[in-house]
Amino acid sequence: MSLCLLFLLWLVSIPLLAHSQPNPRGYLLNCGAGPTSESVTVGNLKYTTDEGFILVGNTSTIKQEDLVPILATLRYFPNKSARKYCYSIPVIKGGKYLVRTTYYYGNFDGGKEPPVFDQIVEGTKWSVVNTTEDYANGLSSYYEIVVHAKSKTFSVCLARNNMTGSDSSPFISALELEYLDDSVYNTTDFNKYALSTVVRSSFGTSEGDIIGFPDDKFNRLWQPQMDQNPIVRCKANVTPSDFWNIPPAKAFHNSITTSRGKQLHVKWPSWPLPSAAYYIALYFQDNRNPSPFSWRVFNVSINGKNFHSNVNVTTKGLTVYAPKWPLSGQTEIVMTPGQGVPVGPVISAGEILQVLPLGGMTLPRDVMAMNELRRNFDNPPPDWSGDPCLPEGNSWTGVTCDRGKFFRVITLNLTGAGISGSLAPNIANLTALHHIWLGGNKLLGNIPDMSSLKELQSLHLEKNQLEGSIPESLGRLPKLHEIFLQDNKLEGDVPETLQDTKINIQLKNEVDSEPESPVNM
């Protein structure tokens, strides 16, 4: 689900400060800014070019006045054959990150409306990007997700889907990764789930007054939430570090309440939600001056089900949460005061994030081997970035994987793809491989040792420029039944292990002990 933000220059949501603040820990990327572009500042945040974090795509400048700088450029991906287009960003392995993608179409391609496409994070299909309604209203769109890094390289990808028009190209305006402290959302098992932001609100905050960095040290954006309930100003400041999620103190400055003895009803968010499990955190603070009498007790229910009982709210603030709470359709929060409590319930802020099951994991050794293979190719396919197997349907071109406890690479087929470079020795670490078909390319160097590929059934390396000898270990692979090596520059004798076997070997006259003398098998 998208969240709307009017990013016009006179309505910058992030406060402008007289003194600069250091950026949050992570990356703020201005997509499509170009290799020589200087950093740009939005509020007091500094965004740098995305060059060096992605190797594919074209750039475009939006011809519209008074845009915030990060919306004035974008990167788009016209290559229809690529299964995905990925950013690769160095991170702390196992670290927890808030990922935000921002989109502003700006009619960059001359089309009638923005394209619709998928976004993928760490191999999991995260959501569909559909900015049509927002753009029609003059708005940009952003999406957020909290996910942990599987390795030292983090991937965020875009991909076409069946709603992407034939003349449309996925695009992106800005990409942000903010490193989160361990305590934040720590009741979620991030080895199994991610948290996709649905809504994050500060109740009673004036329209347009969005809370972000530096009030929120992680640059989470707290949208204003107004309704018909009375607004009160809180007279004491909370300490963010007293809360596991470290909400900004400013999110508690205003609250909504009701009269003594009455229930407080809040319909939030304003749109219906799909049936799913959600992480819900609600934040409260008594708005009066600190004293022994500044407290209030009430029960909280969501859609008629008890959420928390006897919530005792003081001027120090309080949060109640549920890590996996079922929601469907319209959501209503009802706060019912306890007997004899002299003041009505109050609520300051809230977060709802959808619990998103992760789409599995490719064996890390396979990922490392495939990345090394890619680095040894001079011109790998444009979608050879991110997870080689995941999500299913968006694996690397020419790569087929098998599902198990981990996804494993079982076929590598780049026949006639025009690949140059060499075969990395790490191909031997792809121990689940059944088929290697790399014929009809421009590969140089030697055939690496493949003695560990016990599942290998066919090896096609014909019509390349490979040199050296044929590894004798090929004859000891128990399942190998087909070897095509013709039309290379190989030398030496055919290994004894490959003579008098039932393996179908295609060599022609290119295996020579001397340049002029072919070897008889």
Feature locations, PLM:
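Generic structural signal for short, solvent-exposed loop/turn connectors between secondary structure elements
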Residues: T315-L318, T331, G445-L453, D500-D512
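Leucine-rich repeat
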Residues: F406-F407, A428-L433, M450-L456, G475-L480, ...
